């Protein structure tokens, strides 16, 4: 159980989940709702979440989260706080063939199944005095597991095209656009021509 209680009705920055019927399986993408804690919607919000406490900002986030459920937060209606909500462990799953994605159809009453020794995620409360301190706070990196892939010097920033966007947006080509080899080849050739 996790609760985050505050002494006043501070302003919270909450990115709510986008599916009210099944709030946990999501893309973790949304705009932030800026609201007093007492007026926060009863929906689940995903991390990071920031609470402006006046002289400092407190940001809830996670580090080293692998093969374990992340925490969501939910308003404690009418109170100045947020409570942690954890995704239950899947009992049964099914498969969306068109998305090549597994989804949960039934859950258990526990959050994880684990064997042997392992590390567990860090739940982090990062406190900053200025907004400019937020993006340079390295606490999440310091708490994370060490690099397991070795040399990363070959990784460069750049542009990307995702499968689901390829399927929706590619027009005027001599093949059926979609999540298929012709679409991937087209994007590879385009990238090669345009650097």
Task: Describe each PLM feature range.
Residues 1-147:
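N-terminal accessory beta-strand-rich subdomains and adjacent acidic, glycine-rich linkers
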């Amino acid at each position: 159980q996790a609760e985050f209680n505050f002494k006043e009705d501070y302003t919270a920055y909450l990115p709510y989940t986008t599916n009210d019927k099944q709030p946990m399986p999501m893309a973790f993408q949304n705009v932030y709702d800026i609201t007093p804690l007492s007026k926060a919607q009863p929906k689940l919000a995903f991390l990071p979440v920031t609470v402006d406490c006046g002289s400092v900002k407190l940001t809830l986030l996670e580090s080293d989260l692998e093969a374990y459920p992340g925490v969501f937060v939910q308003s404690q209606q009418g109170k100045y706080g947020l409570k942690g909500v954890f995704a239950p462990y899947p009992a049964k799953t099914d498969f969306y063939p068109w998305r090549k994605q597994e989804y949960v159809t039934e859950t258990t009453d526990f959050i994880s199944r684990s064997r042997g020794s392992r590390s567990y995620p860090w739940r982090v409360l990062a406190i900053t005095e200025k907004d400019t301190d937020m993006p340079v706070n390295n606490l999440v990196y310091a708490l994370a597991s060490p690099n397991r892939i070795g040399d990363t010097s070959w990784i460069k920033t750049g542009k990307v095209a995702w499968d689901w966007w390829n399927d929706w947006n590619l027009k005027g080509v001599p093949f059926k656009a979609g999540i298929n080899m012709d679409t991937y080849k087209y994007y590879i050739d385009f990238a090669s021509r345009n650097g």
